[in-house]
UniProtKB/Swiss-Prot annotation:
The lineage of its organism: Bacteria, Bacillati, Actinomycetota, Actinomycetes, Micrococcales. Keywords: ATP-binding, Chaperone, Cytoplasm, Isomerase, Nucleotide-binding. Belongs to the chaperonin (HSP60) family. InterPro entries: Cpn60/GroEL, Cpn60/GroEL/TCP-1, GroEL-like_apical_dom_sf, GROEL-like_equatorial_sf, TCP-1-like_intermed_sf. This is Chaperonin GroEL 2.
Length: 537
């Protein structure tokens, strides 16, 4: 297909226009008084959300050059979501501001490479200061972090209780409830870091995950490549009329293609994953999963082979959720006594080992077996509200986990304002000269934008609020919910520092790339080609 090119300033301006369109769509959602965005869906009801990354994923622009800019801004939101799980709107607003200010300097003749270097040095200084200013999460602050992210005090309390019970490394999953109530249920379950072997296994295309309800579970220690060995068991599973979940060292060749074909045709709802761990540890982890689900590990060591076993070796679980990276098994059918015996065995091993590495791995396995899983059942009056609520609670779980990892800073955009002092004090920033030194001003002007938009969305004059907060002492800022200037940490208006730092770094990364772009290459729209084709004689 023919390509079209754009160069120099025109190229950068197109990228900026695309970033602006996406950022302007997203930034109306920022803050406690932020508005919602309605997303049209090809099937079913529209989605209403205030989650930056969900909105960003839906944006595709007509102009191919502007669309490149929008996709770059989308990358900022997606990357921030992957690392911290929240802060996607903040990241997009910061990227927009850095690009806008930076391009102004480049258009005036500044060297893009120097501007890029200045932005990177300044952002690192601010990110380091944010970490210095962070505090550990204490008591009720867990509920505050969750409540701010989900914009609901009720959800905040629920998540504080969930993390209190499963611990900061514990697994929390989110399911849809058949009632209008949102509640927390603690269940037996475990999570391990292996995802589906093929994207064809996905059952929920929007969330890119495979969900099996009331599934049979086959645990095979070796590889499965021959269909001949595997077919008898597959046919028995088909007759049982239940979904099938397979864990094996690997599944390849005709065995994998048969599973995929059956899945696509709808003959058998099946998902396959690789076994977690390596060597002897893999064997032990498979035994843990077998204990939890009431399965038997199919292994020649135990005299069991795939072609000779029946349904008696399969375990079951109420629900299994598989993403591209993780598998979560909830409510396995293993008996409480078997699980308790296995936990006791692991504890005994733990007391016998001297190796720190072994201890760490045994602790992990213990936590997975004994810790259980917190299941939040989300209820709402309508399907549209249910989806929107689920998005908010997912954000809140990620935010809370981030806060427990690296600590918290004052929220509402004020932490970035207070961290600006680092630009006056950092030796690395002071050493910058020429165009690189001019980039410090770009970062200074960009970092006030999140606060400005939080205030603006709440109906206040953003510039006035920014000027006022700049004069306040550390941890004090503007509470957009009440319209007061106060100690935000005491008021429970807090952000996980990991979220703020990820947002800042990802925004700077994309902005630096846009500023140093000279040429864009995009596909020519099909209509244009057709129009030219008609004039050939």
């Amino acid at each position: 297909m023919a390509k079209q090119l754009a160069f120099n300033d025109a190229a950068r301006r197109s990228l900026e226009a695309g970033i602006d369109k996406l950022a302007n769509t997203v930034k109306v959602t920022l803050g406690p008084r932020g508005r919602n965005v309605v997303l049209d869906k090809k099937w079913g009801a529209p989605t209403i959300t205030n989650d930056g990354v969900t909105i960003a994923r839906e944006v595709e622009l007509d102009d191919p050059y502007e669309n490149l800019g929008a996709q770059l801004a989308k990358e900022v939101a997606t990357k921030t979501n992957d690392v911290a799980g929240d802060g996607t709107t903040t990241a997009t607003v910061l990227a927009q501001a850095l690009v806008k200010e930076g391009l102004r300097n480049v258009a005036a003749g500044a060297a893009p490479g120097e501007i890029k270097r200045g932005i990177e040095v300044s952002v690192e200084a601010v990110a380091a200061r944010l970490l210095e200013n962070a505090r550990e999460v204490e008591g009720t602050q867990v509920a505050s972090v969750a409540a701010i992210s989900a914009q609901s005090d009720e959800v905040g309390e629920l998540l504080a209780e969930a993390f209190g019970k499963v611990g900061k490394d514990g697994v929390i999953t989110i399911e849809e409830s058949s009632t209008t109530q949102t509640e927390l249920v603690l269940t037996e379950g475990m999570q391990f870091d292996k995802g589906y072997l093929s994207p064809y296994f996905v059952t929920d295309a929007e969330r890119q995950e495979a969900v099996l309800e009331d599934a049979l579970i086959l645990i095979n220690q070796g590889k499965i490549s021959s269909l001949q060995d595997f077919l008898p068991l597959l046919e028995k599973a088909l007759q049982a009329n239940k979904p099938l979940f397979i864990i094996a060292e690997d599944i390849e060749g005709e065995a994998l293609s048969t599973l995929i074909v059956n899945r696509i045709r709808g003959t058998l709802n099946v998902v396959a994953v690789k076994a977690p761990g390596f060597g002897d540890r893999r064997k032990a982890m498979l035994q843990d999963i077998a204990t939890l689900t009431g399965a038997q590990v199919v292994s020649p060591d135990l005299g069991l082979t795939l072609d000779t076993v029946g349904l008696e070796v399969l375990g079951t679980a109420r629900r299994i959720t598989v993403t591209k990276d993780n598998t979560t098994i909830v409510d396995g059918a293993g008996t409480a006594q078997d699980v308790a015996d296995r936990v006791a065995q692991l504890r005994a091993e733990l007391t016998r080992t001297d190796s720190d590495w072994d201890k760490e791995k045994l602790q992990e396995r213990l936590a997975k077996l004994a810790g259980g899983i917190g299941v939040i059942k989300v209820g709402a009056a309508t399907e549209v509200e249910l989806k929107e609520k689920k998005h908010r609670i997912e954000d809140a779980v990620s935010s809370t986990r981030a806060a427990l990892e690296e600590g918290i800073v004052s929220g509402g955009g004020s932490a970035l304002i207070h961290a600006l002092k680092a630009l006056d004090e950092s030796p690395a920033v002071k050493a910058l000269e020429g165009d690189a030194a001019a980039a410090v001003g770009i970062v200074r002007r960009a970092l006030v934008q999140p606060l400005r938009w939080i205030a603006q969305n709440a109906g206040f004059d953003g510039f006035v609020v920014v000027a006022k907060v700049s004069e306040l002492e550390a941890n004090h800022g503007f509470n957009a919910k009440s319209g007061e200037y106060e100690d935000l940490i005491a008021a429970g208006v807090i952000d996980p520092v990991k979220v703020t730092r990820s947002a800042l770094r990802n925004a700077a990364s994309i902005a630096a790339l846009v500023l140093t772009t000279e040429t864009l290459v995009a596909e020519k729209p099909a209509e244009e080609e057709d129009a030219h084709a008609g004039h050939q004689h």
